[in-house]
Amino acid sequence: VLAIVCDGMGGHQGGDVASTMAVTHLGHNFSMTDFADANLAHKWLDVQLNSENETILKTADKFPDLNGMGTTIVLAFAFDKNALIAHLGDSRAYSYSEGKFVQLTEDHSLVNELVKMGQITKEQAKHHPQKNIITQALGVSSTIDPEFDEIKMGGNDIILLCTDGLTNSLSDPQIQQILATKELSLRERCNKLISEANRLGGGDNITVCLIWNKEDESSDR
C-alpha cells in the first residue's frame, strides 16, 4: 500500500497542479512495481521524488501562470508489518500504537529551524508570522533531500498522514483522542478529524489519510 498526501503552494491554480502531478505520477508509477522490500522502496522513492521535482520545475518554467508552484509531500509505503515514511515540507506523518501518539516526521520549515536553534519555543512557532515558510518541497529548488524513516507496525497500529491544516487546528492530544475512539470506523475517525479541525477554525486546506494495520483483517487499510 502506498499512501500520499500533498499540500500545494504557489497560488490556487499552481498549488493544485503541483500537488495533483505529484500524487498522480507517483501513484501511477507505483502501480507498475511489485517490490515489498524497504531498501528497494527507499531507492525507488528517492529516484521518483527527484524525478517529480524536476518535472514540476520544468512545467512551471513552461507555463508562466504556474511559475512558483510547488508542493509538500508526505507518504507511507506499508508492507507486511513495516512502513517506510518519506517527506518534504511540513505535511506530517504520525503513528498511533498501543495508546501512544508519535510524530514521525520533522517539519522542513523556517520556524522548526528556529525551534531547533533555541530561538523560539514550539508554542511560539505555532503563531509565528513566518510559520508558512517551507525550507523543502517539490518544485521549489533544483535539489531536494527527502527524509526517510522505517517503522514497525503492530496489530491495530494506525499511521496518520496530514497537511498542516489539521495540525494548525488540532493539538496532538485532540488528534490522539479521536484516533483512540474504537467505536468509530477508520473512515469515521478520518471524517471526525477533518470536521473537528474545521469546527475549531481550520482556515487552510485539510487533508487526512489513515492507514490501519487491522489485526484481524490486515488488508483493511
Each language-model region and where it sits:
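PP2C/PPM-type serine/threonine phosphatase catalytic domain
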Residues: 1-221
